[in-house]
Amino acid sequence: MIRRLLIPNAAAKSHQYIKVSLFSTSAPEITPPFIHKCKTISQVKLIHQKLLSFGILTLNLTSHLISTYISVGCLSHAVSLLRRFPPSDAGVYHWNSLIRSYGDNGCANKCLYLFGLMHSLSWTPDNYTFPFVFKACGEISSVRCGESAHALSLVTGFISNVFVGNALVAMYSRCRSLSDARKVFDEMSVWDVVSWNSIIESYAKLGKPKVALEMFSRMTNEFGCRPDNITLVNVLPPCASLGTHSLGKQLHCFAVTSEMIQNMFVGNCLVDMYAKCGMMDEANTVFSNMSVKDVVSWNAMVAGYSQIGRFEDAVRLFEKMQEEKIKMDVVTWSAAISGYAQRGLGYEALGVCRQMLSSGIKPNEVTLISVLSGCASVGALMHGKEIHCYAIKYPIDLRKNGHGDENMVINQLIDMYAKCKKVDTARAMFDSLSPKERDVVTWTVMIGGYSQHGDANKALELLSEMFEEDCQTRPNAFTISCALVACASLAALRIGKQIHAYALRNQQNAVPLFVSNCLIDMYAKCGSISDARLVFDNMMAKNEVTWTSLMTGYGMHGYGEEALGIFDEMRRIGFKLDGVTLLVVLYACSHSGMIDQGMEYFNRMKTVFGVSPGPEHYACLVDLLGRAGRLNAALRLIEEMPMEPPPVVWVAFLSCCRIHGKVELGEYAAEKITELASNHDGSYTLLSNLYANAGRWKDVTRIRSLMRHKGVKKRPGCSWVEGIKGTTTFFVGDKTHPHAKEIYQVLLDHMQRIKDIGYVPETGFALHDVDDEEKDDLLFEHSEKLALAYGILTTPQGAAIRITKNLRVCGDCHTAFTYMSRIIDHDIILRDSSRFHHFKNGSCSCKGYW
């Protein structure tokens, strides 16, 4: 069979072809233009065969064959021909074309192989060869190969060429060798705009934004080089990371005047810069005026709204992308998931993640971090475990977050398990990391997990481990804030002061605002409201949390007037008053017996402050009225609530019924609580105590039997006291302490002394059906009394004894402490589950409102 090749005839119309027979006996007239008409590999090969069979393959035709093989993508045949081609300028052009073609196809290693082959065959590269080779070295981050090519460029003299120098700077940058990139740049004899772009990009991408802007300043001010659109794309990200929006605005103006603003990449960088500077209105203006947008444009807007807390706008934009069927990438989905998660909408974040998976987009490390944050926010443990399993099943590095930061995914897993109250699982993951693998975030999330959801003592133990010599990580501001939460929980004033001192020593500037807020909260909850006020007064900047924290502290300590003074000052300065602030005001009034003021603030909430009262506000007002004995008014308030009263309101009412011994009203409140939350342990305990105080022991037995039947467990009461050597905890009748004998003897002696001056045991608080003598013995062994005796034994003369109880202080113990403060040389500061009691010289700061 005769095989013919059809090649388009340039001289004829486009549909006419020249026929070339494979077995023709006469030599065809094959010219360079004829060869270049070949469009397929088979056509070029057939021409090649004809030239070989007739022996007419000249160097000129070989050169054109090589060029055509490259153009049709048959690079291997081009290399074969070039190996036998004698060195020449035309041949160097072909080597360059081959190296570039392999580079364009992502075959960097093949580029370097060809470069080595070229050199071994005694070919001399030119100023076009080196940029292609340097680009290949950069793509595979091979500094060694790059240095070899660099040396050859020095030998051949091409290093002085500006294009070669620019490519060399870019290569060292891609290999993360900034010092070499800067050295090459400084040694260049001439710089063009590409040179400046290369060095600015190097600093910008390798985490040196400040130096990048300094180089840009030199480029424009010192050397007068006019920026192009690539310059803007390289300079705007450093502006974003440093928050230098003033320079960003200048670049924006330059982009407008130089007509670069229509460049999509410049527009994207401007949107990103404004978004990261929190200037979303400006970002939206640029975004809206962009004639061409891609997914990067939308991503910058969605991420920007999420970062500044405008989650509704972020979600709205994400939904608009879905409506307009814009193809979203993993960055878009991750930003949307983050927006939902940071709003506390964890289940919505999980829903978006499912949509992402169903659309065929695989999550990356950033996505997992956002989803796990959403799970943590709503306590979705099972979903969190599913994400954990996904991360293990698919090739996702738990120790990377996609931006080079170590441990971000595993840190988020630890945080998720801790916030879902699986602190042991979180600790197991923490322990699975070697000491060298743990970064400061790892320590912080574990300490935070113990502080808020586990064991505050273990949180402080972990903090202590961070200060050991072999630990390479030191606490940062976030670690300190988590540790202060633990101190506040334990009322560990001594340790809190040590942490405060560490923060002052190790902060380069002022203590961060959020740490100062935690210090105010810690000192207030540790019973030192004067130290809390001192921190407040020394703060350079304050926010709503600062003022509210101090106001809460005053309320806890019964200083209602001072709390309202803080509130009035907040109003004068112009802070926005929200529901939380007004709740603290009502709380302070309740714990100070300020009934009229509390009622006035409650009645003015909506009309003056624009805040609708919620269930918590009603509960606080019920507590205010109930503590004052106005139980009928409190009940009317509950019945007139515009919403269904939740358990918290009825519990407040029941607590007041117990204080005033109103059994029937207490039973009514308990019934309401049972209807709404049948396993609420506090309501059963309050009702049982109410019956006990009324001497209705059969009802006490019935309630306790009901609690056992429903599996409701009463928390055991315990008290702890802070001493020189640490914190010591006592339970009722506790005799496990090594110095129990001395503790009981001190207590016995002091109880006898206060009886001599008028103290009479209030046996109604002994919640057991026994005779009065046994009740006296039961009251004697209460945990807060044992803690006080230990404090008397161990506290230096004149220093305050600080006691914390996990439940409400017993009425008899409160009376006993009042008498004790008359006969001992110590102030007694007692914190119970409700408030602080400062006992001094026979009186208590609560004034009976507890």
From Swiss-Prot:
Entries under Pfam families matching the protein: DYW_deaminase, E_motif, Eplus_motif, PPR, PPR_2
Residue ranges, annotated region (Type DYW motif): 756-850
GO MF annotation, one: RNA binding
Record key words, sorted: Repeat
Region (Type E(+) motif): 725-755
Positions of region (Type E motif): 649-724
PPR repeat residues: 58-88, 91-125, 126-160, 161-191, 192-227, 228-262, 263-293, 294-328, 329-363, 364-398, 406-436, 439-473, 476-510, 512-542, 543-577, 578-608, 614-644
GO biological process terms on file: RNA modification
Family: Belongs to the PPR family. PCMP-H subfamily.
Protein name per Swiss-Prot or TrEMBL: Pentatricopeptide repeat-containing protein At5g16860
Species, as recorded: Arabidopsis thaliana
Higher taxonomy: Eukaryota, Viridiplantae, Streptophyta, Embryophyta, Tracheophyta
Encoding gene per record: PCMP-H92
